[in-house]
């Protein structure tokens, strides 16, 4: 095969992937208009599998047309030509990642360096797609603030009427005056830059933009919801970067948003959320493979500019995962152990399936996103002998040492958080009460979207920077509707009552909510905190009703912003 033919074949595979991805994404607005929430979830899951399908197709074609042995000179020329094709491509960075995926499926990891793949983004010095391609500007000085906001709303054809748009705009303007700095209060002192298409997720659409004035740039997010079958309404205005970071958080499902130039969209969002990494923003808008590429580049850059050693991650060691971390880098590396603890009656394949289940599910801000990698290379010098020994003992079949490098065959990477049990050890009563209340709320929100976490011990939950409680241990995750919730059998005789343990049969899917406090909250103070805020969690009927709601087709909406900011309180 000629270099040009190979380069064109890979680029054609990428084009097919991107067109299908955008075609799938474009179904979200109609599903939102029809209030077809199941379709929204189906679209979200389908997009996640698109990428690997197209990579597999392209790889299979190349295998049919060339030998398995790498022709180094040929592939050096292929990469050079491919790079030329991308100079003015609007999705160049995604096309580079697609190339990497195809090459890495074809050849051995010894070729995974910048000569043959795009370890570095080679187009960083090329002319960038202008950010202006992704937004439209509005000038209140021309028509006034209220008419301008009405123009913005009407620009988006939601294919459904508003219940009372005049009321919503009045509440929106009132909220804007309350939240915006004084310098924004005059129409001639500002400009609105609004992204062309809404962001869809779950049961909401979000209009995203920024307010530009002499005092700086401020996020501008409007949440749009359905009022049952009566029509649309504006639900909230958010104008703080910190609020925006929560909405775009790592524990939420990916947004569905149409874009011709993802790099321009990400740069726009990064200006509004400078504390978010490029990788996190690509993930947030659904390009999780690009997020994976950008994250690995961030990791390599961090390794170059740091010298600390890897250590065992803080927290109680698990029976399924070996977890280590680099203290100066805010993530943990999770590797499936060779052997599980006796209380884990399942194997590696089950763990892989459960992590994939969470990846494709609505995480409602309560389940950390994971990045899955194969054949990750670590500098051996950054591991001390004690840690290496522990790795050999627990994940020996998943690691290889080659010269100065440690290669992990398969791992997951998650955001590092403070384990809830460790947080509580050092928390005062007020902080502990808040954390336990958040823990209970996290359980309720996962339950509402048909997720049963399985192991609900405090050690399996983390405390984020925003003091949110996030679940991160997925080896026992199952659908709520697959579980059998039971009340504890009552003692039949006085002798039964005196026994420390009741004698009754328990099936694998059986769950006894009454035992939640017994096993999860042994500290009586924590139990008191939980019972004062979420007493229904130990009521078997609460769990059964949650199951029935899901079976009846009810789809819950978890608000990613404080309910106090909802306009509905001022109707």
UniProtKB/Swiss-Prot annotation:
Q: Where does ATP bind?
A: 313-319, 334
Q: Which domain of life is it from?
A: Bacteria
Q: Which reaction does it catalyse?
A: L-seryl-[isocitrate dehydrogenase] + ATP = O-phospho-L-seryl-[isocitrate dehydrogenase] + ADP + H(+)
Record-listed E.C. numbers: 2.7.11.5, 3.1.3.-
Q: Which InterPro entries match?
A: AceK_kinase, AceK_regulatory, Isocitrate_DH_AceK
Q: Which residues form the active site?
A: 369
Q: Which GO terms describe its cellular component?
A: cytoplasm
**One Pfam family for this entry, by name?**
AceK_kinase
UniProt keyword list: ATP-binding, Cytoplasm, Glyoxylate bypass, Hydrolase, Kinase, Nucleotide-binding, Protein phosphatase, Serine/threonine-protein kinase, Transferase, Tricarboxylic acid cycle
Which biological processes are named by the entry's GO terms? Answer: glucose metabolic process; glyoxylate cycle; tricarboxylic acid cycle
Q: Where in the cell is it found?
A: Cytoplasm
Coiled-coil residues are none
UniProt GO MF annotations: [isocitrate dehydrogenase (NADP+)] kinase activity; AMP binding; ATP binding; phosphoprotein phosphatase activity; protein serine/threonine kinase activity
The entry sums up its family as follows: Belongs to the AceK family.
Q: What does this protein do?
A: Bifunctional enzyme which can phosphorylate or dephosphorylate isocitrate dehydrogenase (IDH) on a specific serine residue. This is a regulatory mechanism which enables bacteria to bypass the Krebs cycle via the glyoxylate shunt in response to the source of carbon. When bacteria are grown on glucose, IDH is fully active and unphosphorylated, but when grown on acetate or ethanol, the activity of IDH declines drastically concomitant with its phosphorylation.
Q: What is this protein called?
A: Isocitrate dehydrogenase kinase/phosphatase 2
């Amino acid at each position: 095969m000629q270099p040009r033919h190979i380069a064109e074949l890979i680029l054609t595979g990428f084009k097919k992937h991107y067109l299908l991805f955008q075609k799938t994404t474009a179904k979200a607005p109609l599903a939102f208009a029809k209030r077809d929430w199941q379709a929204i979830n189906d679209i979200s899951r389908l997009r996640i599998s698109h990428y690997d399908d197209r990579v597999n197709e392209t790889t299979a074609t190349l295998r049919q047309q060339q030998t398995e042995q790498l022709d180094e000179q040929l592939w050096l020329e292929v990469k050079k030509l491919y790079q030329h094709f991308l100079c003015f491509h609007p999705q160049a960075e995604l096309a580079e990642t697609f190339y990497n995926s195809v090459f890495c499926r074809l050849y051995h990891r010894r070729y995974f360096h910048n000569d043959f793949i795009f370890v570095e983004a080679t187009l960083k010095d090329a002319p960038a797609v202008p950010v202006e391609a992704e937004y439209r500007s509005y000038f209140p000085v021309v028509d006034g603030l209220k008419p301008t906001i009405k123009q913005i709303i009407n620009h988006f054809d939601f294919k459904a009427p508003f219940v009372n748009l005049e009321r919503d705009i009045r509440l929106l303007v009132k909220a804007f005056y309350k939240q915006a700095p004084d310098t924004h209060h005059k129409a001639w002192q500002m400009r609105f830059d609004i992204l062309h298409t809404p962001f869809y997720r779950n049961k909401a659409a979000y209009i995203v933009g920024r307010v530009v004035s002499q005092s700086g740039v401020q996020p501008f997010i409007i949440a749009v919801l359905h009022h049952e079958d009566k029509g649309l309404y504006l639900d909230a205005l958010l104008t703080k970067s910190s609020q925006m970071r929560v909405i775009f958080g790592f524990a939420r499902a990916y947004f569905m948003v149409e874009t011709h130039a993802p790099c321009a969209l990400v740069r726009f969002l990064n200006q509004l959320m400078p504390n978010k990494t490029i990788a996190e923003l690509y993930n947030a808008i659904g390009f999780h493979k690009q997020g994976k590429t950008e994250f690995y580049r961030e990791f390599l850059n961090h390794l170059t500019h740091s010298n600390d050693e890897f250590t065992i991650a803080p927290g109680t060691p698990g029976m399924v995962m070996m977890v280590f971390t680099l203290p100066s880098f805010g993530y943990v590396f999770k590797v499936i152990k060779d052997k599980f603890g006796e209380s884990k009656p399942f194997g590696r394949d089950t763990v892989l399936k459960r992590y994939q289940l969470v990846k494709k599910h609505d995480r409602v801000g309560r389940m950390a996103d994971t990045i899955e990698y194969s054949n990750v290379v670590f500098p051996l010098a950054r591991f001390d002998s004690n840690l290496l020994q522990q790795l050999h003992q627990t994940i020996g079949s998943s690691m290889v040492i080659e010269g100065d490098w440690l290669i992990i065959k398969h791992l997951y990477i998650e955001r590092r958080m403070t384990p809830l049990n460790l947080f509580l050890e050092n928390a005062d009563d007020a902080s502990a009460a808040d954390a336990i209340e958040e823990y209970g709320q996290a359980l309720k929100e996962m339950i509402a979207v048909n997720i049963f976490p399985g192991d609900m011990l405090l050690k399996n939950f983390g405390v984020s920077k925003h003091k949110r409680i996030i679940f991160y241990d997925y080896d026992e995750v199952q659908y709520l509707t697959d579980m059998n919730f039971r009340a504890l059998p009552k003692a039949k005789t006085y002798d039964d009552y005196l026994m420390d343990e009741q004698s009754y049969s328990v099936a694998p899917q059986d769950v006894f909510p009454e035992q939640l406090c017994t096993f999860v909250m042994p500290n009586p103070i924590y139990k008191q905190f939980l019972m004062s805020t979420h007493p229904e969690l130990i009521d078997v009927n609460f769990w059964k009703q949650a199951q029935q709601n899901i079976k009846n087709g009810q789809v819950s909406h978890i608000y990613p912003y404080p309910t106090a900011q909802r306009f509905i309180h001022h109707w």
